[in-house]
């Protein structure tokens, strides 16, 4: 009898081990967090855990099955799915089962786990990628979708990430705002139902809400206490975060491109890659989470993240559009006297048939205005070099004024609706970057400037309009792809610029802080937080952005805004970020100028 019992115990143990081997547990760890998946008896992938790092196998083995990791449309789930596909035969469903997974080293200290899922009825493959940066406690995730059906399938939803949490309470911190009023922090509890943060603006996508959030677990986290999950999407276009609490008080977070008006026709054999979603978990408050992002960005994501930044003097508030060569040469001398590294020439230097004397005309015609700059940009670069400083230049190459030669010659390059009156934002329209010819033109703006003036040392790349009049002459019957292909076209241009001019730093700007994502910051060394430079209000704006971005990535200038405050206070606030000046130095008192000179020297 004892022998039979022992045999039965051994048999059951072996059976359990074999079953466990058939149903893998996939562990993804950073130094202080864990994300655990397991394959269930039905062959589907489930997220069992997300939170503080689990160090013992016994803890992992006793985790519950959890919730399906990447929920599909059309099956038994009752809430928001991560993916929705329409097959060739009209079937709108997808059932994903585990196929395989692998973990590999990407670089020293960075690992990637790839989980492959497939539909058992249709030849559709979905790969979930998880890249870990252990020391910084950052996980990057994205999704790849492909198929082998005879004709293109239609993608209606295609999330970068789906995460599940099961806690008593959830508190969302969002960062909403508007022009000159960016990154306002507000907290709210999440209860049954759905909360959506999204944008449909296209080019100037983050004007009302930026692509990041904080989520406190169980109680509202403070700077140094509490559990918090912090996430951001690397996408310079329409995004959507969906937070849905279900009938069991379980929360799903779906992050990715906003699928609004963006059904995507995916041909067989082509891989649709979603943007990257980055997140970190902290058990020690929001401050630790923000420092995780700062450390990671400097080491891995931000262009020249470990390099110093150039201080500068911008001419905008001193001149606006009213300047000539003589006046600018004087300002270059002022910049040198201040001690900054660079003089930055802002808007107003280009176009001849329709000279850029205001924001109503000239945008798109990137030749120097002969009346203002008879000797071109080259003369200004020479003068800056003589003074021992660098020269930088403002451009807005993705945009066009209807009153321009570019618009007259290439209206087919412009996003605009047929048979409709045009609606303008800041008197301009957006060029169609889904069109390869337009991509060549935009790259050519930078390339021509650099070819003719190789000592130009910096670009301020602006983007002042969202997409209006939404129609692409180039895409024709594929209008649903415009919001996506337009952003991909921007990236194509930026990659070419970075490859040809790797040592030229650039500032990302969009009427203030309406562009601020980590995919764009692969190509830019810094971004402009806000056109609001009132130092009191700037403190709050900079605090909001600092939750995600390191100080060296955020530009802040000393200006005449709120001149009731002292120059010292304005300079101190600007010095919290990447320091610049945008003020008429000749209007300063002698002691104020002296203080600024000392501040620049100390900053450098």
Predicted regions and their residues:
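Short Pro-Gly-centered flexible turn/kink motifs
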Residues: 32, 92-98, 264-283
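N-terminal structural segment of carbohydrate-active enzymes
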Residues: 28-39, 47-52, 66-68, 75, ...
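Active-site neighborhood of glycoside hydrolase catalytic domains
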Residues: 369-376, 382, 386, 407-568, ...
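Bacterial Sec-dependent N-terminal signal peptides
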Residues: 1-23
């Amino acid at each position: 009898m004892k022998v039979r019992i022992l045999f039965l115990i051994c048999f059951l143990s072996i059976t359990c081990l074999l079953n466990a081997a058939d149903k893998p547990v996939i562990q993804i760890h950073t130094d202080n967090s864990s994300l655990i998946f397991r394959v269930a008896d039905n062959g589907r992938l489930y997220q069992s855990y997300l939170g503080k790092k689990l160090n013992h196998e016994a803890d992992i083995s006793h985790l519950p099955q959890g919730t399906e990791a990447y929920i599909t449309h059309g099956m038994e789930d009752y809430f928001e799915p991560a993916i929705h596909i329409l097959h060739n035969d009209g079937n709108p469903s997808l059932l994903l089962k585990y196929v395989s997974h692998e973990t590999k080293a990407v670089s020293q200290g960075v690992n990637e786990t790839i989980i492959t899922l497939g539909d058992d009825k249709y030849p559709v493959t979905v790969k979930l990628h998880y890249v870990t940066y252990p020391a910084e406690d950052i996980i990057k995730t994205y999704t790849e979708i492909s198929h082998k059906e005879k004709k293109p399938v239609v993608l209606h939803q295609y999330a970068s990430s789906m995460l599940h949490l099961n806690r008593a309470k959830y508190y969302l911190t969002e960062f909403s705002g508007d022009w000159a009023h960016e990154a306002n922090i507000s907290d709210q509890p999440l209860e049954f139902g759905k909360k959506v943060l999204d944008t449909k603006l296209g080019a100037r996508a983050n004007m009302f809400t930026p692509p990041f959030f904080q989520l406190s677990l169980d109680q509202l986290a403070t700077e140094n206490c509490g559990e918090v999950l912090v996430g951001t999407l690397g996408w310079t276009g329409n995004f959507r975060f969906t937070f849905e609490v279900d009938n069991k008080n379980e929360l799903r977070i779906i992050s990715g491109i906003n699928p609004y008006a963006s059904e995507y026709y995916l041909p067989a054999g082509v891989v649709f890659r979603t943007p990257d979603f980055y997140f970190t978990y902290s058990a020690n408050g929001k401050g630790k989470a923000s420092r995780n992002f700062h450390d990671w960005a400097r080491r891995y994501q931000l262009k020249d993240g470990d390099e110093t930044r150039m201080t500068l003097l911008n001419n905008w508030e001193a001149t606006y559009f009213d300047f000539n060569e003589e006046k600018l040469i004087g300002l270059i001398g002022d910049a040198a006297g201040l001690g900054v590294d660079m003089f930055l020439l802002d808007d107003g230097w280009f176009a001849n048939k329709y000279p850029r004397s205001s924001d109503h005309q000239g945008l798109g015609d990137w030749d120097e205005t002969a009346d203002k700059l008879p000797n071109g940009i080259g003369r200004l670069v020479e003068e800056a070099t003589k003074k021992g400083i660098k020269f930088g230049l403002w451009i807005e190459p993705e945009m066009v004024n209807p009153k321009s030669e570019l618009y007259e010659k290439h209206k087919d390059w412009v996003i605009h609706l047929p048979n409709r009156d045009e609606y303008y934002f800041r008197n301009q329209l957006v060029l169609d970057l889904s069109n390869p010819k337009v991509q060549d033109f935009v790259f050519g703006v930078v390339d021509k400037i650099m070819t003719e003036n190789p000592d130009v040392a910096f670009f301020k790349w602006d983007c002042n309009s969202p997409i209006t009049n939404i129609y692409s002459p180039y895409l024709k019957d594929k209008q649903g792809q415009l919001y996506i292909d337009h952003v991909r076209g921007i990236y194509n241009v930026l990659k070419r610029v970075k490859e040809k001019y790797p040592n030229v730093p650039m500032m990302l700007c969009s009427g203030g802080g309406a562009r601020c994502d980590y995919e764009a910051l692969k190509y830019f060394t810094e971004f402009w937080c806000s056109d609001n430079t009132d130092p009191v209000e700037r403190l709050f704006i900079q605090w909001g952005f600092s939750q995600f971005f390191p100080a060296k990535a955020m530009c802040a200038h000393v200006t005449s805004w709120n001149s009731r405050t002292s120059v010292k206070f304005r300079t101190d606030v600007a010095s919290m970020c990447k320091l610049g000046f945008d003020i008429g130095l000749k209007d300063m008192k002698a002691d104020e100028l002296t203080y600024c000179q000392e501040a620049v020297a100390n900053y450098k």
